[in-house]
Curated annotation (Swiss-Prot):
FMN binds at S21, K45, G46, N99, N127, K165, I191, G217, G243, G244, G265, T266. Its main location: cytoplasm. GO terms for biological process: 'de novo' pyrimidine nucleobase biosynthetic process; 'de novo' UMP biosynthetic process. The active site is at C130. This is Dihydroorotate dehydrogenase B (NAD(+)), catalytic subunit. Catalyzes the conversion of dihydroorotate to orotate with NAD(+) as electron acceptor. Pathway: Pyrimidine metabolism; UMP biosynthesis via de novo pathway; orotate from (S)-dihydroorotate (NAD(+) route): step 1/1. Substrate binds at K45, N69, A70, V71, G72, L73, N127, N192, T193. Belongs to the dihydroorotate dehydrogenase family. Type 1 subfamily. Gene3D superfamilies: Aldolase class I (3.20.20.70). It is found in: Cytoplasm.
């Protein structure tokens, strides 16, 4: 067996395979199907300072080779997470990471401060694709100023590993990654969903209640792969790649492009065991290519 271990900030992971937020619940939901302790890291669903009801239905739509979602970060808030969910998941033998969202910088900071006190949560992932309600609704992650302000504020309040999840809905994602790195991010993950929409031609109405939503799945992979390659060349912190990873081969491609770890999202809805299959597939690939460690393929793309 090859050495699959990777480091993301202070996180020492047993392998580079993680689950994407919003596609794996709190991990416990999958425990009847697979050995979830084999996964390198589980990123739980988005958590906000206060309870959120989410968007009205319909808020999901299937598309060719993908899906659209506009769930709207439905969750019961960070206090509920700390008091009711954390006690259930804290002893799962893998890294449990919390995805943090907010509608103002102080929301991110307060949420991060609360999670910082949870001993067995070693990292957070900042979702900066959220609209800043104090700045006319523009997402934090679409300008270097917005990225810098939220990352810097959270970094000052949060002492563990800080992962920043980047939006692809920008002109230059490498600039956003550099801004995150300059303001204290330990790692960047990309890509978040692409903005898309679906229309019911007979009704002449949008399918989603919000009109637009986030697109994920196999169709976005070439875009995600290109962005990971660009960002990996632009920063000196570990890059976590995601977007359309449906099998082990996709995962290997992201690592060749420069990702130190990968996240599996939409594929979890299709095959609950996909994470385990990808872990085994990466190991088989390394052995076939005579690699003793997964580090040998990170950024090994020959251009």
């Amino acid at each position: 067996m090859a050495d699959l271990s990777v480091n993301i900030g202070k996180l020492q992971m047993k392998n580079p395979v993680m689950t994407a937020s919003g596609t794996f619940g709190y991990g416990e939901e999958f425990a009847d199907f697979i050995d979830i302790t084999r996964i390198g890291g589980i990123i739980v669903k988005g958590t906000t300072l206060h309870k959120r009801e989410g968007n009205p239905y319909p808020r999901m739509a299937e598309t060719p080779s993908g899906m659209l979602n506009a769930v709207g970060l439905q969750n019961k808030g960070v206090e509920y997470f700390s008091n009711h969910i954390y006690p259930r998941i804290k002893d799962i033998q893998t890294h449990m990471i919390v995805n943090v969202s907010g509608s103002a910088i102080e929301d991110y900071v307060k949420t991060a401060e609360i999670i910082n006190e949870l001993d067995k949560i070693p990292a957070i992932e900042l979702n900066i694709s959220c609209p800043n309600v104090k700045q006319g609704g523009m997402a934090f992650g679409v300008t270097t100023k917005g990225v810098s302000e939220v990352v810097q504020a959270v970094r000052s309040a949060y002492k563990k590993t800080l992962i920043v999840k980047l939006s692809p809905n920008v002109t230059d994602i490498a600039e956003m990654a550099r801004a995150a790195e300059a303001n204290g991010a330990d790692s960047v993950s990309l890509i978040n969903t692409l903005l898309g929409m679906a229309i019911d031609a007979e009704r002449k109405r949008p399918i989603l209640s919000t009109v637009t939503g986030g697109m994920s799945g196999a169709a976005v992979k070439p875009i995600a792969l290109r962005m990971v390659w660009q960002v990996a060349k632009a920063v000196n912190i570990p890059v976590i790649g995601l977007g359309g990873i449906m099998n082990w081969k996709d995962a290997v491609e992201f690592m060749l492009a420069g990702a130190s770890a990968i996240q599996i999202g939409t594929a979890n809805f299709i095959d609950p065991a996909i994470t385990i299959k990808v872990i085994d597939g990466i190991n088989d690939y390394l052995e076939r290519h005579g690699c003793k460690s997964v580090s040998e393929i990170i950024g090994a793309l020959e251009v």
